[in-house]
Amino acid sequence: MTDTLKLEGVGLDVRDGASLHTLLEIDEFRLEPGEMIAVRGASGAGKTTFLKLVSGILLPTRGRVLYGDTELSALSEPRRDRWRGRHVGFLFQDFRLFDGLTALENVLLPFTFCSRTVSNTQRRDATDLLKLHGVNPDTRSELLSRGEMQRTVLVRVLMQSPSIILADEPTASLDANRAGHAVDALISAAGSLGASLVLVSHDERVLGHFERHLTLADGRLTPRI
């Protein structure tokens, strides 16, 4: 079952010597099931920190992060890790693929890390998805183009069937044409899963692909007019 994710009165503070600095202050944020949102902010605005709060990697200094009726800060770290593994899929700017492993092996890696046996069906599904996205399953990751690396990571997320996909600067280093295709593929993939999507970027080009836009500046999240 997919639930609404909410941030209520959330603040994240850090101490620098005797001074206390507020990194983020978010009065309210809601992500409905299947909703897709773009968050734009300049470099250093706190976009990655925001995603870490949404996913429970970071806990707020004050306020609550809720998934349905579950308050993430009330969970132990192992339970938060399990919640994240079950519900959240990440696309990072640096791809996080392992050299020496094939595209297929990289896609199936989360199942290996979780000590789960990879079934023939999962292997076949991953192979088919890679081919569908134009990636040779047998190519080692260090030999893939940046676009192929990105699509490999997307397939890895699809195989996890998350209810929330968080994308951190997925169009970085891509030209306008490839950036558009990458965002379209991501939106299509999220839609095929019925997953919610939060994409953060400094790239103005991505905004036209989303109905809901937010801006992160000076540590605050506001609707984009």
Short names for language-model regions:
Residues I165-D168:
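Catalytic Walker B motif of ABC-type/P-loop ATPase nucleotide-binding domains
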Residues S161:
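Conserved catalytic motifs of ABC-family nucleotide-binding domains
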Residues G63-E71:
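Conserved ABC transporter NBD signature motif
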Residues E71, N120-P137:
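Conserved ABC ATPase "signature" region
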Residues R140-Q150:
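Conserved ABC ATPase signature
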Residues L72-G89:
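ABC ATPase NBD coupling module
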Residues S55:
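Helix-to-loop junction immediately C-terminal to a conserved catalytic motif
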